[in-house]
A protein has these predicted regions:
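RNA pseudouridine synthases
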Residues: 1-223
Length: 223
């Protein structure tokens, strides 16, 4: 493990709950690029080796149901049984796996906003390190370079606090949609033009909601 960047177990797996729920700290990757690299998943496997019984989207990701960016802290869900993992992927495709993020945002006018932002995305910035939301009235170049799928973020902003929920996520989706609204995340070096170079990104994956495939009961886990 690296420094103080260690996961915290929020919920352990059981017969009726074949998942591990962890709180990932900022600065720790969700998944490894190569087997055994220090990351949230590797640390979880050290505690719960049965995670390796699951075949995931990528071989080294095993039962990891979803990722959050390295700079983001918060909740991750990891399956310990294949059937449960497969079912959760189906729920994600059906929009039944809801992830909520909370953020401190730049909002000097103290605007109160409640809206839904829906867009496609295209790579943007140096070496495609960022994404740009693309809307129906976008430029010809943007419309050519964006993907075909639309992604939706439900956003509520009150002062400098934002709560954002998504059912299906794209890379940097929430950060890019908040920046589009003129309320970028404080400490976001990619999407906040006011970033001064030293701030910590104030962004957290604070809640997940899904149906437990074993019990068919709704589950809500929050920080």
């Amino acid at each position: 493990m690296c420094g103080n960047e260690s996961i915290k177990v929020l919920k352990e797996p059981s017969e009726n709950f074949p998942f591990v729920v962890i709180n990932k700290p900022k600065g720790l990757a969700s998944a490894p690029l190569r087997e055994g690299e220090d990351c949230a998943l590797t640390q979880a496997i050290e505690l719960f080796p049965q995670i390796k019984n699951v075949t995931g989207k990528k071989t080294v990701e095993y039962g990891l149901v979803h990722r959050i960016d390295t700079a983001t802290s918060g909740i991750l869900l990891i399956a310990t049984e294949q059937d449960a993992y497969n079912k959760l992927l189906e729920f994600q495709k059906e929009g039944k796996f809801i992830k909520t993020y909370t953020a401190t945002v730049y909002n000097p006018e103290n605007k109160n906003i409640k809206t839904v932002v829906q867009s496609r995305f295209r790579p943007f910035g140096p070496k495609g390190s960022m994404v740009k939301p693309v809307f129906e009235d976008g430029s010809t170049a943007d419309l050519k370079k964006c993907g075909p799928k639309f992604y939706t973020t439900r956003i509520e902003i009150s002062g400098n606090k934002a709560v954002c929920s998504i059912a299906e996520g794209y890379r940097h989706q929430v950060s890019a949609h908040l920046a589009y609204l003129g309320c970028p995340v404080e400490g976001d070096k990619l999407y906040n033009p006011h970033y001064a170079g030293e701030e910590i990104m104030l962004f957290e994956a604070s809640k997940i909601e899904f149906t437990n495939p074993v019990t068919q009961k709704n589950v809500t886990i929050s920080l």
